[in-house]
Amino acid sequence: RDSSTSRGLGDVYKRQDKSFEERVQINYDHPDSFDMERFTDDVRRLKAGETIECPVYNYAEYKRDKDTVTVEPKRIIILEGLFLFENPALSDLIDIKVFVDTDADVRILRRIIRDVKERGRSLDSVVLQYLTTVKPMHERFIEPEKKRADIIVPEGGYNEVAFDMIVDAIKHKLN
């Protein structure tokens, strides 16, 4: 754990100087909603051994908080999030590209539980968002990302054999 750090794409949604009502209407499941330039620069700087200040995203308010989190560079940098392989400049910085493939039923159930419990959303709003933006954007952008992955992990992350292989690949890269 001391030799790794992680960085999530979800913290770099683009700044929105709009009202709450306007922010709620934004399609956050499209690659254009992320500040990919900022995220790519952060990854580049971490790989160069620099400490970075990462924004914190407030999902209940649909905007970045004023606070930031300091992230120290480590030997292993784990990136998580959608669209990581979509941007060539970012994708080129990733040594091992892992796509965790999860069944659609599991994805919607996880989203409902997370958004209702952690983000205070109504069930109706989560289902509407899933049908209007999440599912179509998944089919348009996320499914094609599988082709860019070095490793595809089936079973939504509950695949010990696949993760043992990933750990071995990381160890090999470090040596």
Predicted regions and their residues:
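Receiver (REC) domain switch/active-site residues of two-component response regulators
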Residues: 11, 95, 150
